[in-house]
């Protein structure tokens, strides 16, 4: 505890801020805690002061009595005027005066500390224990030239406090709260959280308290300010503070009343089916103009007229009125690939929505009116759903139409028996697949291990067959078939010893806990 007032000597902290230094001790408000601690310190100083004053008075009495005795004492002619006795008395008197001087120095130090406590907001200290001159602010001649600084004499301890600068003043809190209510009026939300931005000098002060003075029980002003402002806003907004999942985080600088809104996104999850080829999963900028708009893209800035993302997001954004959106899916299919079965799991993230509560069934109906994409199982999700879809391994079932390169038919024996045998050879087969050439511009050049668990091959004619595989997600099926110039090993072309390619590909199922594989 700061019984020597070292902290107050460096920082003239008000009662609230002084209590915040010891915020982790005792369950009470910082202002009450600070007042209580200062009171105990003041009582300790006053007790020492009383003892010193009493000791000083006793010494004064001793000196006074000694002087009276010396004046009335008869000189003994037979003892050479008793010079030795007088010298001893003078020495003793001088010693007592030195002690009084030392006591006065101690008394002055204690009074300086008591004056400092009064100056920083502690009432109840006796006036005789205060050094009046120290109560006045030491304003230099240059400072006096400024009207603003001349008024410093009339500032409260809180306004003078270098830590809080009186930001906890109820008027300041109410003004900030009213600004926040106005800023939030255009947003729909159920829960909120207050965040506090501190100026650099305040952060440095807090760090100094922790390092220089080794105070480990300190609470940052940002925590207390957020707590106090949150109480006022809870009543004004009639909505609760939520530290875990707030819809909106209100960032406040309490020193200049600036407000910043962090509107957290909403997440809507479901599954989509792509029943038409030629639709990419996400928006593609025009290759010629890079999204700026040109004759080739009919000034749309898009390489393709639409995408799965745009079809799903448009009706959502029309209602939510967000600033942007992003589609997160469990993998992706190529533009020329269908996505059938129960559909691919996805999450649509709406950034900074003004409306959070929507009729998802109605939105689902709107999406399903558009040819080529269907959605199902729409419901509200959370941010963790995005991580799950991105990181959780999914197994998948594909169906491919495999064709043999025409010019190679004459040079290779293609028999139906080989196709039937291929099913057995592919089952439980490990595939080492280096990043395909066609995606090497956007994916790291690595060798990835994937597994085929089950395969079914069915001949169609003398140069094509149907291939169905149940395998790990992330296995490039087109390259599994072609071999990609040896980058995928083994490949179907290698096993059959005849060059093959994928003519058509369809994702039949994306398997997860809600859609397990039953093979």
Swiss-Prot record:
Which residues belong to any copy of the THUMP domain? 144-265
Q: Which residues cross the membrane?
A: none
Under which main EC class is this enzyme filed? isomerase
User: tRNA processing among the record's keywords?
Assistant: yes
Any single GO molecular-function term of the entry would be: tRNA pseudouridine(55) synthase activity
Q: Which UniProt keywords apply?
A: Isomerase, RNA-binding, tRNA processing
Q: Is Zinc there in the keyword field? A: no
Active site, per annotation: 334 (nucleophile)
What InterPro entries would the database entry show? PsdUridine_synth_cat_dom_sf, Pus10, Pus10-like, Pus10-like_C, Pus10_THUMP_arc, THUMP_dom
The record's catalysed reaction(s) read: uridine(54) in tRNA = pseudouridine(54) in tRNA; uridine(55) in tRNA = pseudouridine(55) in tRNA
| Known EC number | 5.4.99.25
Gene Ontology annotations of biological process type: tRNA pseudouridine synthesis
Please note every region of biased composition (Basic and acidic residues): 77-98
Binding positions for substrate? 398, 476
Extract the SMART domains matched here: THUMP
Give the region (Disordered) as residue ranges: 70-98
User: Which family does the similarity line name?
Assistant: Belongs to the pseudouridine synthase Pus10 family.
| Functional note | Responsible for synthesis of pseudouridine from uracil-54 and uracil-55 in the psi GC loop of transfer RNAs.
State the protein's name. tRNA pseudouridine synthase Pus10
Species the sequence originates in: Methanococcus voltae (strain ATCC BAA-1334 / A3)
The encoding gene is: pus10
């Amino acid at each position: 505890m700061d019984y020597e007032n070292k902290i107050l000597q460096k920082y003239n902290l008000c009662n609230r801020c002084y209590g915040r230094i010891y915020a982790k001790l005792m369950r009470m408000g910082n202002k009450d805690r600070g007042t209580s601690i200062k009171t105990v310190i003041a009582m300790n100083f006053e007790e020492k002061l009383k003892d010193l004053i009493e000791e000083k008075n006793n010494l004064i009495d001793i000196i006074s009595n000694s002087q009276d005795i010396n004046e009335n004492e008869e000189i003994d002619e037979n003892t050479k005027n008793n010079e030795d006795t007088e010298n001893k008395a003078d020495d003793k008197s001088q010693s007592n005066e030195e002690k009084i001087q030392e006591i006065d120095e101690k008394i002055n130090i204690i009074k300086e500390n008591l004056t400092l406590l009064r100056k920083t907001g502690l009432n109840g200290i006796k006036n005789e224990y205060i050094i009046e001159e120290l109560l006045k602010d030491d304003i230099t001649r240059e400072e006096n030239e400024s009207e603003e600084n001349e008024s410093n004499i009339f500032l409260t301890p809180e306004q003078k406090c270098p830590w809080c600068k009186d930001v906890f003043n109820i008027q300041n809190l109410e003004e900030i709260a009213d600004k926040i209510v106005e800023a939030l009026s255009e947003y729909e939300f159920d829960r909120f959280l207050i965040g506090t931005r501190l100026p650099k000098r305040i952060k440095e002060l807090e760090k100094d308290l922790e390092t220089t003075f080794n105070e480990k029980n300190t609470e940052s002003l940002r925590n207390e300010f957020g707590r106090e402002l949150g109480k006022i806003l809870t009543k004004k907004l009639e909505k609760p503070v939520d530290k875990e999942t707030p819809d909106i985080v209100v960032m406040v600088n309490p020193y200049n009343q600036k407000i910043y809104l962090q509107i957290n996104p909403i997440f809507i999850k479901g599954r989509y089916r792509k029943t038409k080829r030629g639709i990419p999963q996400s928006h593609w900028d025009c290759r010629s103009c890079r999204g700026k708009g040109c004759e080739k893209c009919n000034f749309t800035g898009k390489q393709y007229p639409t995408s799965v993302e745009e079809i799903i997001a448009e009706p959502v954004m029309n209602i939510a009125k967000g600033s942007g959106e992003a589609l997160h899916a469990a993998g992706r299919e190529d533009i020329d690939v269908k996505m059938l079965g129960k559909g691919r799991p996805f999450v649509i993230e709406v950034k900074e929505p003004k409306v959070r509560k929507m009729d998802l069934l109605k939105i689902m109906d709107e999406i399903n009116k558009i040819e080529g994409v269907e959605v199902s199982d729409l419901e509200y999700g959370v941010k963790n759903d995005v991580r799950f879809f991105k990181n959780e391994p999914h197994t998948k079932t594909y169906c491919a139409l495999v064709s043999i390169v025409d010019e190679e038919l004459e040079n290779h024996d293609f028999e139906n028996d080989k196709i039937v045998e291929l099913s057995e050879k592919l089952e439980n087969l490990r595939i080492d697949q280096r990043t395909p050439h066609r995606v090497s511009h956007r994916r790291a050049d690595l060798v990835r291990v994937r597994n085929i668990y089950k395969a079914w091959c069915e001949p169609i004619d003398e140069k094509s067959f149907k291939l169905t595989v149940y395998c790990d997600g992330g296995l490039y099926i087109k390259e599994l078939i072609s071999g990609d110039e040896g980058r995928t090993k083994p490949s179907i072309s290698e096993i059959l010893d005849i060059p093959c390619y994928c003519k058509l590909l369809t994702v039949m199922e994306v398997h997860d806990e809600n859609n397990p594989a039953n093979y």
